[in-house]
Regions:
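Walker A/P-loop
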Residues: 1-28
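Conserved Walker
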Residues: 2, 45-56, 70, 87-103, ...
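Conserved AAA+/SF3 P-loop NTPase catalytic/coupling segment centered on the Walker-B
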Residues: 10, 31-32, 58-85, 117-125, ...
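Short glycine-/polar-rich loops that comprise or flank the Walker A/P-loop
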Residues: 19-21, 61-62, 87-89, 103-105, ...
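Conserved AAA+ ATPase "SRH/arginine-finger" region at the nucleotide-binding site
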Residues: 24-27, 129-139
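Structural recognition of the conserved hydrophobic beta-strand(s) that form the central parallel beta-sheet
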Residues: 25, 65-68, 83, 92-93, ...
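Short glycine-rich substrate-engagement loop in P-loop NTPases that contacts/grips substrate
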Residues: 28-60
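Basic, amphipathic alpha-helical bundle interface domains used for macromolecular binding and assembly
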Residues: 136-137, 142-187
Length: 187
């Protein structure tokens, strides 16, 4: 969706509804070492031994990995994240270290089509695509801005204020997750 459609706010709210899972943000300037992991330099210098230091992908396991402006991320890194998440494993072979760890993350990505789009073969790898339209009603836009500001001013107060609504929605999502294994796609 376009700028100002609260895509980032919506993505952050997913963590609140996901039963204690954390939201980790993948920065656009991420390096391969930051993403996949690398040698723990401090450990190597102080003890003279090589040790693997997990990257963002390892920390995102059992959590939510958020990519804001995914269309601006280097495409080879985005493809590698999608590959690892699809395979359920990240294999790291670098600097004399061989490491393998599980990857089980919920991936949420946003993009502003004004700044370019993702190729269809990349979009196809996401489970769902939602086109967010900009709100034109002034009252709705004001409400979104007020809530975003309230959240940034005092997160705990914001959570208390909307706790009942959040709990109700989280319960609905939990019930839907329970039903999901019983869902069969028709021909």
């Amino acid at each position: 969706g376009a700028k100002g459609t609260a895509k980032s706010v919506l993505a952050r709210s997913c963590a609140e509804l996901a039963g204690g899972r954390r939201l980790l943000t993948l920065p656009l300037n991420v390096t391969e070492d930051m993403l996949f992991g690398s040698i723990d330099i401090e450990y190597a210098v102080s003890l003279g031994e090589k040790r693997f230091s997990p990257g963002i992908l390892a920390r995102a396991t059992d959590n939510i990995l958020y990519i804001d402006e995914a269309n601006l991320l280097r495409q080879e890194l985005l493809t590698a994240v999608l590959d690892a998440n699809s395979a359920g494993v990240n294999n790291v072979e670098r600097d004399g270290i061989s490491c393998r760890h599980a990857v089980r993350t919920t991936l949420i990505a946003t993009m502003n089509p004004e700044e370019g789009t993702l190729p269809p073969h990349i979009l196809d790898r996401f489970g769902m695509y939602v086109d967010v339209q900009a709100l034109t009603a002034v009252q709705e836009r004001v409400e979104i801005m007020q809530r975003a500001l309230a959240y940034s001013r005092n997160i705990l107060d914001f959570r208390r204020r909307y706790a009942e609504e959040t709990q109700q929605l989280a319960a609905k999502l939990a019930a839907a997750r329970e039903l999901l294994p019983q869902v069969a796609a028709s021909d």
